[in-house]
Amino acid sequence: MGNKGYSDNDILSLIESSIKQGNADIEKFHENLLSNLNKIDKIKNIKAIIEKKLSEKNIYFIRHAESEHNVLEAKYAYDEFEKWNIQDPKLTKKGIEQTKSASEKLKNFNIHFDTVFVSPLTRAIQTYFLIEKDLNNDAKIIVTDFIKEVVNSQLDKNKGKKLSLLKEEYKNTKLDFQYMTKEIWWYNLGKEIDKESEGQTNFLLRLGIFILWMAFRPEKNILLISHSHVFVNMQESFGIRNADVVKMNNNDLVKKVNWMINYSD
């Protein structure tokens, strides 16, 4: 596509090699990614390419089922966050029950998924395992912190388990952690400091990079199992209920990745 003979696979390799570098500071990541795209003369027409590629994909989103912090958040005021601020909360009994309706919706969609992307937070991983039986056996299951919940230094609910613990706990499952290389992955990318919240700009940058990654991957049918803020900031939407299954609007995804490409501080 580019006048230097770079293929889509070359672009995909570029993106994935960046993702595997250990999730360096997201702004530097973004700067380097666009610099590399410019070097291979793709940036001039990449927006049209991305729009075409995303138009060929069916992308579905499941928000994790109800978890312990959802119940407590509804009970206590935000300024009482110490009463509901549970680190890496698990699903409630109601949440476990909710996944049955998610499974039914998946059956009704009747989609053969090529790849499932899962947030590394426990509530998302649990949701995956509860619907796993209703997914086709040959789907790739990729765990990535690029679709973790937005990082706020005060909120323990979005701090998870160390990567080594995740790999050990799920070593006999289909979960693939190859794109996660950082032991402490739940802080602002590249800044392992409790005082460092992610901020909206960095959050949108990582989501835009993730959408770019999806666009250049070969899979057609994709499922994301993630969080409410991820959905709202990928789509022109006010929200999504726990365990709901939604087909994503690809035009909204194009807008988000275009914002990432155009962003300059």
Predicted regions and their residues:
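Active-site-proximal alpha-helix that buttresses catalytic centers in soluble enzyme cores
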Residues: 5-139, 143, 152, 244
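A short, well-structured juxtamembrane/interface segment
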Residues: 99-105, 203-210
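Residue-level signal for well-ordered alpha-helical positions
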Residues: 130-131, 169, 237-238
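Phosphate-handling substructures
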Residues: 68-90, 133-208, 259
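Universal eukaryotic N-terminal targeting presequences
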Residues: 1-4, 48, 264-265
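Residues at the C-termini of beta-strands that transition into short coil/loop
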Residues: 63, 145-147, 249
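Active-site-adjacent alpha-helix immediately C-terminal to a catalytic or transition-state-stabilizing loop
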Residues: 125, 205-263
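Conserved anionic group-binding/transfer micro-motifs
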Residues: 95, 99, 116, 166, ...
